[in-house]
A protein has these predicted regions:
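A cross-kingdom feature marking charged/low-complexity
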Residues: 46-70
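Short, well-ordered alpha-helical segments
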Residues: 4-37
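Alpha-helical structural elements
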Residues: 1, 34-35, 52, 60
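Amphipathic alpha-helical hairpins
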Residues: 2-5, 9, 25, 44-46, ...
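Glycine-rich loops and low-complexity Gly/Arg-rich segments
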Residues: 34-38, 65-68
Length: 70
């Protein structure tokens, strides 16, 4: 196994369709600008309520991505 070094960044993924989709949306979007994303950690879960029903989900994530070797 090779030694790896990771950088960690925090994002918030959102979705009206649920927590799972908010995670997927956040990772998919981050993957457009970050390479080598290997793991995530959920740090927060919250949502927006409108007229007594859940309107939108927000999930705070830490993403770990590998630094490239020279």
């Amino acid at each position: 196994m090779t030694n790896r070094t990771y950088r960690v960044t925090e994002i918030v993924g959102t979705s009206p369709d649920g927590i799972d989709q908010a995670i997927r949306n956040g990772i998919e979007r981050a993957g457009q600008t970050l390479r080598h994303i290997d793991w995530f950690e959920v740090t927060q879960v919250r949502g927006q309520v409108k007229d007594g029903t859940v309107e939108h989900y927000q999930v705070g994530l830490k993403l770990g991505f590998r630094l490239e070797d020279d």
